[in-house]
Amino acid sequence: MSKRETFNETFLKAARGEKADHTPVWYMRQAGRSQPEYRKLKEKYGLFEITHQPELCAYVTRLPVEQYGVDAAILYKDIMTPLPSIGVDVEIKNGIGPVIDQPIRSLADIEKLGQIDPEQDVPYVLETIKLLVNEQLNVPLIGFSGAPFTLASYMIEGGPSKNYNKTKAFMYSMPDAWNLLMSKLADMIIVYVKAQIEAGAKAIQIFDSWVGALNQADYRTYIKPVMNRIFSELAKENVPLIMFGVGASHLAGDWHDLPLDVVGLDWRLGIDEARSKGITKTVQGNLDPSILLAPWEVIEQKTKEILDQGMESDGFIFNLGHGVFPDVSPEVLKKLTAFVHEYSQNKKMGQYS
């Protein structure tokens, strides 16, 4: 596939709050498990095997652009990708997810953590980005990273958790060690993400998947300062910055305070409600991914409701409120993308009130 001459800037315009001829759309986890081509690859390769091979990884990344017509691609990688670079051994186990055999338990464990050198430690990430941007994509490529709290939760729990008790106990009982861990992870994230931008990523999304486990007061005490440092550094790169977390609607106002461009919402907080609470930056979201398993009439109606709310401002990007489920039909995503484009374009032209 050769890169087309016409570059689709719709996503970038919306991220900056500028006018575009239609509402841009992309989907979290659009590349991967819901696609037959990907499942066929997974019969032969593990996740890390795919992500370590730029040609394969680029293929998976660009599939949704070619098949669904989305307005942005997101790099196919795992949030755990950079952790081995600082001395954290990670294994992806089927049916479980990321597993860390030697969880963080002390200040000494944190002091042992090293620094990332992207060119040496994750060259395959940078090569994939360059391959996509220089040869294969006519839409912006979104790079990404996990956020400190979510990465720390895996490092302390040793894997996925339902309540994050060990993580929060560590945070409360060893604040100095916690602050050092946040600082080291922030250093890693800043260097890792800047390398993605230098390689050609046109926007960045920071995923804080599990930060909703914290109340607002604890977020402001233990997390918000380090997030401010991360976004302040990344803002110097002049690409749109997006923040997203699941079950964290109570933190949307705090995200809005950070030097970022786009506030990602899950399905629990309506766009109208978010804006009534003072969210004036671009909003991204927020169709409940479960709705994609419903009849098309339901999908269409719920999508209209979100578009009608979101399009009250030029700063709106249509997405799901979480990742695409494995059992969602690719045909549904293709149809949904076309509907968002057509409905929003007609609405912008005044055909819908």
Curated annotation (Swiss-Prot):
Function: Catalyzes the decarboxylation of four acetate groups of uroporphyrinogen-III to yield coproporphyrinogen-III.
Primary location class: cytoplasm
Subunit and partners: Homodimer.
CDD domains membership: URO-D
Residues with site note (Transition state stabilizer): D78
Record pathway: Porphyrin-containing compound metabolism; protoporphyrin-IX biosynthesis; coproporphyrinogen-III from 5-aminolevulinate: step 4/4
Name by which UniProt lists this protein: Uroporphyrinogen decarboxylase
Superkingdom of this protein's organism: Bacteria
The organism of origin for this protein: Bacillus subtilis (strain 168)
EC number(s) on file: 4.1.1.37
Compartment(s): Cytoplasm
UniProt catalytic activity: uroporphyrinogen III + 4 H(+) = coproporphyrinogen III + 4 CO2
Family, as annotated: Belongs to the uroporphyrinogen decarboxylase family.
Molecular-function annotations in GO: uroporphyrinogen decarboxylase activity
GO cellular component: cytosol
Binding locations of substrate: R29, Q30, A31, G32, R33, F48, D78, Y154, S209, H322
Top-rank EC class of the record's enzyme: lyase
Keywords: Cytoplasm, Decarboxylase, Lyase, Porphyrin biosynthesis
UniProt-listed InterPro entries: UROD/MetE-like_sf, Uroporphyrinogen_deCO2ase_HemE, Uroporphyrinogen_deCOase
Residue stretches in coiled coil: none
Gene Ontology terms: biological process: heme biosynthetic process; protoporphyrinogen IX biosynthetic process
